[in-house]
């Protein structure tokens, strides 16, 4: 692999003492691969390190962390307007790793790192909310958002993605739907929503396939609504076959407008955003990402 250009790894501070990762990086460096490593400590670090990556002339910026880290790095990359931006590499080190998992990124660190450095760079979409906040994986609203933001860190560290489901079961007494109206291209719905998923990617909340047909290079966002008419069936339908389920509403559009009579909160790759009005739009081909050739998220 000695002929591959330099890369810069932006590593979430929680993974700074990951010994297997240190060993994998050392082995690649011994093969002649140049890998710069930077560790995030506070919000804004990813943007600063992407700026540094451009000054260093690297061709790949690797996001080492969970969905939140991938979001920060990818958002910084799409801000580049002059010249060709570095490609995005994925190194899943978070609690759930929903985007990386659905994209087929290997769990083994050495294999994921090699893919992040040497994989083919494919153009993929991102999404933007209210002309400001971006997400690469999914925007989720409703009960699911409350669960992912409230799940204790110790529970996530111990159980990983399944911690979200367990915490959800513990909070069944708080199940309340959000009344809202959603419009898109050839789509209109209004009613009580228990969970709303608007996906560029397919899964969120620790492996729940909220938007199972989503693709990251089709110029569309997938919508799935779990209505509040039957709360328990809607909650568990992500674990079962959803065909002909009257509690599930699906849609696809390049944009969605959401209006609620009261404040609701969306979780954008782990970052909460509250309000009553949301305009969510796809950004086609917003960045290049190094993905496996059989990535299930590509058409």
UniProtKB/Swiss-Prot annotation:
Residues 2-133 form the DAGKc domain. It holds the Pfam family DAGK_cat. This is Probable lipid kinase YegS. Binds 1 Mg(2+) ion per subunit. Ca(2+) may be able to substitute. Keywords: ATP-binding, Cytoplasm, Kinase, Lipid biosynthesis, Lipid metabolism, Magnesium, Metal-binding, Nucleotide-binding, Phospholipid biosynthesis, Phospholipid metabolism, Transferase. GO terms for cellular component: cytoplasm; plasma membrane. It comes from the Bacteria. The active site is at 271 (proton acceptor). It comes from Salmonella schwarzengrund (strain CVM19633). Belongs to the diacylglycerol/lipid kinase family. YegS lipid kinase subfamily. Its cofactor is Mg(2+); Ca(2+). ATP binds at residues 40, 66-72, 95. Its main location: cytoplasm. The keyword ATP-binding applies. InterPro entries: ATP-NAD_kinase_N, Diacylglycerol/lipid_kinase, Diacylglycerol_kinase_cat_dom, Lip_kinase_YegS, Lipid_Phosphate_FormReg, NAD/diacylglycerol_kinase_sf, YegS/DAGK_C. It is an enzyme of class 2 (transferase).
């Amino acid at each position: 692999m000695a002929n591959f250009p330099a890369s810069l790894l932006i590593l979430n501070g929680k993974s700074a003492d990951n010994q297997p990762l240190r060993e994998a990086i050392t082995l690649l460096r011994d093969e002649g691969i140049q890998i710069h490593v930077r560790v995030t400590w506070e919000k804004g670090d990813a943007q600063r390190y992407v700026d540094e990556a451009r000054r260093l002339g690297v061709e790949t910026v690797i996001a080492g962390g969970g969905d939140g880290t991938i979001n920060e790095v990818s958002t910084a990359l799409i801000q580049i307007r002059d010249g060709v931006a570095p490609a995005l590499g994925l190194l899943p080190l978070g609690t759930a790793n929903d985007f990386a998992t659905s994209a087929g990124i290997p769990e083994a660190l050495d294999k994921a790192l090699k893919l992040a450095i040497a994989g083919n760079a494919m153009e993929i979409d991102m999404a933007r909310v209210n002309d400001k906040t971006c997400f690469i994986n999914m925007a989720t609203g409703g009960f699911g958002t409350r669960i992912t933001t409230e799940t204790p860190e110790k529970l996530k560290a111990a159980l990983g993605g399944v911690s979200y489901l367990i915490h959800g079961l513990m909070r069944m007494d708080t199940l309340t739907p959000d009344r809202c109206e959603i419009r898109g291209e050839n789509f209109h719905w209004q009613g009580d929503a228990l969970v709303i998923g608007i996906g560029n990617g397919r899964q969120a909340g620790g492996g729940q396939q909220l938007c199972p047909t989503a693709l990251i290079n089709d110029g569309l966002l997938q919508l799935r609504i779990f209505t509040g008419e039957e709360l328990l069936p809607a909650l568990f339908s992500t674990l079962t076959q959803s065909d002909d389920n009257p509690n599930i509403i699906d849609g696809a559009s390049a944009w969605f407008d959401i209006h609620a009579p009261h404040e609701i909160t969306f979780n954008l790759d782990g970052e909460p955003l509250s309000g009553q009005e949301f305009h969510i739009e796809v950004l086609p081909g917003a960045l290049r990402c190094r993905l496996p050739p059989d990535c299930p998220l590509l058409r």
